[in-house]
Curated annotation (Swiss-Prot):
Gene responsible for this protein: minC
Keyword Cell cycle part of the UniProt annotation: yes
Pfam families per record: MinC_C, MinC_N
InterPro entries assigned to the protein according to its UniProt record, in alphabetical order: CAP/MinC_C (IPR016098), MinC (IPR013033), MinC_C_sf (IPR036145), MinC_N (IPR007874), Septum_form_inhib_MinC_C (IPR005526)
Keyword line: Cell cycle, Cell division, Septation
Any one of the GO BP annotations: cell morphogenesis
Source organism per UniProt: Thermotoga maritima (strain ATCC 43589 / DSM 3109 / JCM 10099 / NBRC 100826 / MSB8)
Annotated protein name in UniProt: Probable septum site-determining protein MinC
């Protein structure tokens, strides 16, 4: 299910396609324990998950789990192993895990991915080609483009807000939209009536939770 591979990309944690995230987390812990003193605290690795799009919502929990075990994820790879050559990877794309802190005081550039298990606040822009994976809500004090996935731990109560919400994709829990907010108008995306709606900040009407 999980294994570490030494490749030209460096040390990669390869996670096969799976059905149960808890089983994956337990397998990671067991594999690291089995490897004894191979790792030192703070060692950096790459992460590749087969069927990446299916499991992208699990990345914050996996990254957080690895951090609790003393390992830092430096980049996320999208691709697969080469048949007959287990230590060779066919990498389709790679993104740098730029920050795991919840307050970011800079622009998030194309090719960078921010992963955090809670809320993420960005004082800057999120450029096209960038991605945020957040367990909670995402608030951008700037222009938000690229992909923003929120509520991956918190669920449908999470929101995505920006001074200019021009994202390529917004995901909140299991809901996805490619809609954008009104240009240059502070807006909030939230789940309402089992879909994501985007409303101006001064006109937002949240769905009441029971």
């Amino acid at each position: 299910m999980v294994d570490f591979k030494m490749t030209k990309e460096g040390l990669v944690l390869l996670i096969k396609d799976y059905q149960n995230l808890e089983e994956v987390l337990n397998a990671i812990s067991a594999r690291i324990t089995q490897m004894g003193g191979f790792f030192a605290k703070g060692d950096r690795i790459s992460l590749m998950i087969e069927n990446h799009n299916k499991h992208s919502q699990d990345i914050p929990r996996i990254v957080s789990h690895l951090r609790n075990l003393g390992l830092e994820v430096s980049q996320i790879l999208v691709g697969s192993t080469v048949e007959g050559k287990e230590n060779d990877l066919k990498v389709q794309s790679r993104t740098t895990v730029e920050s795991t802190g919840k307050v970011i005081k800079r622009n998030i550039r194309s090719g960078q991915t921010v992963v955090h298990s809670g809320d993420v606040i960005v004082f800057g822009n999120v450029n096209k080609g960038a991605e945020i994976l957040a367990g909670g809500s995402v608030v951008v004090f700037g222009k938000a483009q690229g992909n923003i996935r929120a509520g991956l731990n918190e669920g449908g109560q999470a929101v995505v807000a920006a001074l200019d919400l021009q994202t390529s994709l917004i995901q909140i829990a299991g809901f996805i939209t490619h809609s954008k907010g009104e240009e240059n108008v502070p807006s909030i995306a939230h789940v309402k009536g089992n879909r994501i709606v985007i409303e101006p900040f001064d006109k937002v009407s949240f769905e009441r939770s029971e």
